Amino acid sequence: MNFEVFENLDFPNIKKLYNLCLDNEKNLSLVKNLYARENRDLQETLNFLIDLDVLKISGNLVLVKKNDNFKNFLIDRIILKPKYSLPLKNYLQNYISQENKVINFKPNSGYNILSSSLRNFLISANIVEHNIESNDYKLLDTSQLDKIRKSEYSPEQLDLEIKNQKELGLAAEKLVFEKERLNLLKIDKNL
């Protein structure tokens, strides 16, 4: 599962950028400057909102899809994108027992590290809470869980996601191959 799509995403930062865009739709430069004063990870946050079709950039203009309940709106947008929703759905399944009851989740250290980007995003959105004493995680917002669990994707959406992942993997393989080739040429120029 690709939990890294949530790397450097923090709900308060996302909401701050969204609100700044609402207040300054005609001046993206101002939005960036205001955001950067108190927040971090501007590019990741901006790309995330653009990828979810919450924001659209046209020159220095920012087109914003407006919604009064930002948290629910954001989750709804995430559900529409398999790139984000599949890791989210997979991770949240850990909070469901075999009897279909909500339980606390205590991941092993490897999974905890692997899923840390997504987990930290959920903690920042007050969907999950870390209990330090028992070192487990508690689901705070079960309404979001139900919504995400019920989400489904068309075969076309899943095929497109698989195609995109294959293209990304192929590009990475080509990059590694080229680097190895250059390293070999340093050793022996006749290769």
Kindly give the residue locations of the regions a language model identified.
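Internal, well-ordered alpha-helical scaffold/interface segments
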Residues: 174-178, 182
